[in-house]
């Protein structure tokens, strides 16, 4: 079977796409809170160590897996793992590479729609009115709980449907004409908006005090294991590692594309957005403008409280506050847009490459699945559905898949001889293929041994500290009640019911994988032709 796949039209296109998948709410909201509550400037030390020993190596691994998968006509982990092991069970192990984006898609589009709504409210001046009336908390809660109406319909539902339609429309154009083009436009706009906000923040009187709160090192925190775990977790989260996204995007590379430099460039872009933009905008200005508040109080607001309540309040106190609010939510919207399409693309790629669906059929199928999951998130928001989905899709499974990938790269792919470079193993031959600057040999032990061990220690440490409590729900009070669809039930019962739903989704996914291989649509012998596209047509 000869299969023609889409591809990136330029190197800058794939770099911006991968960077766009990583740059999101985690950069502008999660990172500042993590840094401020884990030693301030001292947090950067374990963060950079984790970036060098964990983030960059695992990113190179995922780019390599993606290149290998694309050579055999696959764009996701089931196909990649199957080609590496040549064993039937490997494709089911690869389902772990589809579960994170699937689970995240169940809630991410809804959250993305909040940003679109608040961008609209900023432009119209409604948000400034709410801030001046000191009712931002009530306004936000009413909105997400579907109490804010446009006519008879909750505003949150309307903006969700608009956002869902926009994402679907962009994805319908494919990798080159859809994802690549939107990232070429959105990423520069996002960075420009971020730089404008940074410049404005740095001109605020006494901002040095806010920066001191953020960056004044508390080196005593470096002896706390939780700080190192938090730093590693932040690197994992912010670089989109273990999500199957980088693997999928790398599968659309042209032959001889430089993945060593491309990976570093994408990682550096994400780091700039996180450390320079995220670390400068949020906490420093919040400390200055929210008189009497300290880091701990601000951090307790959480990601959503900080982004949708604290920051509108803070910007509302500045001259031209509505413009600042619009820039803030506009920046977050472009970050959310580039992340959203990257989350859904691996699912579409699986349908196209392994189930042999057409692009429209693949998008329709995934849209139905994600819409059903989104409805559960919307209706179960107050009951904790989003938190539960984020734990599995945005935290736990990322580390599990990342650890598995690291061991496969180091102890399976790196043990296989390259057909094209007999003196080299398959892992590093593919990683260095087409690279202008080859990976230094002294860095190989870090990739082969330090990174897998680092990940294993991270996973075991988490299990030893609070992992079992989270998995078994022992920290949830038996008498804690939540409401879902108008019915009151215990939080434990709701959470286990949601987990049963996720297990059923996992089973159905593996049934789809079995169907793909049984019907010969994902067989190992097929050849792939990558469409060559001139740069001028991008």
Please report, for each region that a protein language model flagged, where it lies by residue.
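Membrane-interface "cap" regions at the ends of multi-pass membrane proteins
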Residues: 1-29, 58-63, 67-95, 254-258, ...
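Inter-helical loop and helix-membrane interface segments of multi-pass membrane transporters/permeases
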Residues: 2-6, 34-38, 68, 73-96, ...
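Membrane-embedded translocation segments of transport machinery
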Residues: 2-12, 180, 184-337, 341, ...
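Extracellular loop-to-transmembrane helix junctions
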Residues: 6, 35-65, 155, 398, ...
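Transmembrane helix-boundary motif of multi-pass solute transporters/channels
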Residues: 10-50, 209, 245-247, 260-264, ...
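Transmembrane helix-loop junctions in multi-pass membrane proteins
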Residues: 25-34, 41, 167-178, 199-211, ...
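A generic transmembrane alpha-helix motif of multi-pass inner-membrane proteins
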Residues: 155, 387-402, 439-538
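Hydrophobic alpha-helical segments of multi-pass membrane transport proteins
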Residues: 334-343, 363-373, 393-432, 450-465, ...
């Amino acid at each position: 079977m000869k299969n023609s796949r889409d591809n990136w039209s330029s190197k800058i296109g794939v770099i911006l796409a991968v960077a766009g998948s990583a740059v999101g709410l985690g950069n502008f909201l999660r990172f500042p809170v993590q840094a401020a509550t884990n030693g301030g400037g001292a947090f950067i030390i374990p963060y950079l160590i984790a970036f060098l020993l964990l983030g960059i190596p695992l990113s190179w691994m995922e780019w390599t897996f993606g290149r290998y998968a694309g050579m055999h006509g696959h764009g996701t982990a089931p196909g990649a793992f199957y080609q590496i092991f040549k064993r039937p069970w490997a494709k089911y192990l690869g389902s772990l590479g589809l579960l994170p984006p699937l689970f995240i898609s169940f809630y991410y589009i809804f959250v993305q729609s909040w940003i679109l709504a608040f961008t609209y409210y900023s432009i119209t001046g409604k948000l400034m009115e709410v801030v001046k009336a000191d009712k931002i908390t009530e306004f936000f809660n009413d909105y997400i709980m579907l109490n804010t109406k446009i006519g008879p319909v909750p505003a949150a539902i309307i903006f969700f449907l608009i956002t869902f339609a926009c994402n679907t429309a962009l994805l319908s154009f494919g990798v080159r004409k859809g994802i690549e083009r939107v990232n070429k436009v959105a990423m520069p706009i996002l960075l420009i908006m971020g730089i404008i906000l940074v410049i404005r923040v740095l001109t605020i009187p006494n901002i040095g005090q806010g920066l001191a709160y953020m960056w004044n090192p508390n080196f005593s925190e470096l002896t706390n294991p939780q700080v190192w775990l938090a730093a590693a977790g932040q690197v994992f989260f912010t670089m989109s590692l273990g999500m199957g996204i980088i693997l999928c995007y790398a599968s659309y590379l042209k032959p001889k594309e430089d993945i060593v430099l491309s990976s570093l460039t994408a990682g550096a872009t994400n780091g700039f957005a996180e450390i320079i933009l995220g670390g400068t905008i949020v906490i420093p200005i919040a400390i200055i403008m929210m008189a009497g508040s300290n880091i701990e109080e601000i951090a307790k607001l959480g990601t959503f409280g900080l982004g949708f309540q604290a920051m509108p309040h803070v910007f509302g106190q500045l001259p031209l506050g509505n413009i600042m609010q619009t820039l803030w939510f506009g920046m977050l919207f472009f970050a959310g847009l580039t992340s959203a399409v990257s989350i859904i693309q691996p699912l579409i790629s699986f349908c196209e490459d392994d189930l042999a669906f057409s692009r429209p059929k693949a998008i329709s199928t995934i849209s139905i699945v994600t819409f059903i999951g989104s409805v559960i998130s919307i209706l179960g928001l107050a009951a904790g559905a989003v938190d539960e989905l984020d734990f599995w899709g945005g935290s736990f499974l990322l580390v599990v898949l990342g650890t598995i990938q690291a061991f496969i790269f180091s102890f399976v792919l790196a043990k296989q001889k390259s057909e094209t470079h007999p003196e080299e193993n398959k892992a590093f031959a593919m990683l260095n293929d087409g690279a202008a600057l080859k990976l230094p040999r002294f860095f190989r032990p870090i990739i082969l041994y330090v990174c897998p061990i680092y990940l294993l220690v991270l996973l075991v440490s988490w299990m030893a500290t609070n992992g079992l409590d989270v998995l078994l729900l022992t920290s949830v009070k038996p008498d804690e009640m939540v409401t879902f669809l108008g019915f009151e039930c215990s939080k434990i019962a709701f959470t286990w019911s949601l987990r049963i739903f996720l297990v059923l989704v996992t089973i159905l996914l593996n049934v789809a994988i079995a169907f793909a291989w049984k019907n010969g649509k994902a067989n190992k012998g097929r050849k792939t032709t990558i469409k060559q596209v001139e740069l001028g047509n991008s």
